[in-house]
Amino acid sequence: MLKPDSLRRALTDAVTVLKTNPDMLRIFVDNGSIASTLAASLSFEKRYTLNVIVTDFTGDFDLLIVPVLAWLRENQPDIMTTDEGQKKGFTFYADINNDSSFDISISLMLTERTLVSEVDGALHVKNISEPPPPEPVTRPMELYINGELVSKWDE
């Protein structure tokens, strides 16, 4: 699976506290299933819920959400373009620990395609990333909340 590590990198690049405190970020794959058909190849699609848990977070909630949205735009765009994706594709809940910190659990309904081809009697497996986003899509490198620069990252 490519997407869990990709999202982890996106979050640690965008949220400084997660880069300096990687134990605050936990990622789990739940409710996985495989979709396959009786087509000529054994290609299939992995479907799963990716749970992203950030513990003891003291920053602004949007500092976590905006990088996830930017990542989804390129890695699971149907969450933003389909009714089902908009309703159930990106959900969260938070546990308020005290006046200054909270734990947040973000759930993302993701898919990943895997191509399986047969060449000279051998099976070859390749994980396929999402097609590139339509142009022009800007890729911001800074995040401002209430007019204050709270994060900068490199592509």
Curated annotation (Swiss-Prot):
Superkingdom, natural source: Viruses
Pfam families tied to this protein: P2_Phage_GpR
Job of this protein: It is proposed that R and S are tail completion proteins that are essential for stable head joining.
Family assignment from sequence similarity: To phage T4 tail protein GP15.
Protein name listed in UniProt: Tail completion protein R
GN (gene name): R
